[in-house]
Curated annotation (Swiss-Prot):
Tissue specificity: Expressed by the venom apparatus.
Source species taxonomy: Eukaryota, Metazoa, Ecdysozoa, Arthropoda, Hexapoda
Range of residues in the leader sequence: 1-20
Compartment(s) of residence: Secreted
Family classification: Belongs to the caterpillar 3 family.
Highest rank taxon of the organism: Eukaryota
One example GO MF annotation: toxin activity
Modification after translation (UniProt): Contains 3 disulfide bonds.
SUPFAM superfamilies: Kazal-type serine protease inhibitors
Protein name: U-megalopygitoxin(3)-Mo3
Function of the molecule: Probable toxin.
Length: 86
């Protein structure tokens, strides 16, 4: 009986965290617009933020749920690589 409640509470926590990540809105941060290509910040998991302000804002938002973002290399798409070569 006890394990049934633990499973239910765990599932609710996962759903809540997923909702928090999904419903973050970068416009709520009040970050000024930047040129996207020169100021991108990326995570190890492949998420790309337009600028440092958005990354820091999302990090602060997620830290309330105990989640930490880790910076990683920005992966260029095939189109972006071709454009960079020109």
């Amino acid at each position: 009986m006890y394990s049934k409640y633990v499973i239910i509470i765990s599932l609710l926590a996962v759903v809540s965290l997923g909702s928090a990540i999904e419903f973050w809105n970068p416009e709520e941060c009040g970050c000024p617009p930047f040129d996207k290509t020169e100021n991108e910040v990326c995570t190890k998991h492949g998420t790309t933020y337009d600028n440092r302000c958005q990354f820091d804002c999302h990090q602060k938002f997620l830290s309330k749920s105990g989640v930490a973002l880790e910076e990683g290399p920005c992966i260029l798409s095939a189109e972006a690589e071709e454009e960079a070569k020109k």
